[in-house]
């Protein structure tokens, strides 16, 4: 199966979120990080699987999820000034929001 570039970026994004949640749990014992990172990773893995067959649905879900993460982690960055994880996730999420918006426009 040949993956599109958008699928590869989505899979990398899901992996980043999942690994980040796991790291938060392992380093600080944060169950919230584990659940939030795992849940976000699962959502974006679903987007990854839906992109080839239903790009409008997948991109729509991707926009909502990545925009929510941009807002939440951006707010956290402004409050804590910690680049990792809040700054990193907010910037990557902002880029992914734009990518999903581009995909949605292109698919419509």
Curated annotation (Swiss-Prot):
<keyword id="KW-1133">Transmembrane helix</keyword>
<protein>
    <recommendedName>
        <fullName>Protein FATTY ACID EXPORT 7</fullName>
    </recommendedName>
</protein>
<dbReference type="InterPro" id="IPR005349">
    <property type="entry name" value="TMEM14"/>
</dbReference>
<feature type="transmembrane region" description="Helical; Name=3">
    <location>
        <begin position="85"/>
        <end position="105"/>
    </location>
</feature>
<keyword id="KW-0472">Membrane</keyword>
<dbReference type="InterPro" id="IPR044890">
    <property type="entry name" value="TMEM14_sf"/>
</dbReference>
<feature type="transmembrane region" description="Helical; Name=2">
    <location>
        <begin position="55"/>
        <end position="75"/>
    </location>
</feature>
<dbReference type="Pfam" id="PF03647">
    <property type="entry name" value="Tmemb_14"/>
</dbReference>
<dbReference type="GO" id="GO:0016020">
    <property type="term" value="C:membrane"/>
</dbReference>
<feature type="transmembrane region" description="Helical; Name=1">
    <location>
        <begin position="32"/>
        <end position="52"/>
    </location>
</feature>
<keyword id="KW-0812">Transmembrane</keyword>
<comment type="similarity">
    <text>Belongs to the TMEM14 family.</text>
</comment>
<dbReference type="GO" id="GO:0005739">
    <property type="term" value="C:mitochondrion"/>
</dbReference>
<comment type="function">
    <text>May be involved in free fatty acids export.</text>
</comment>
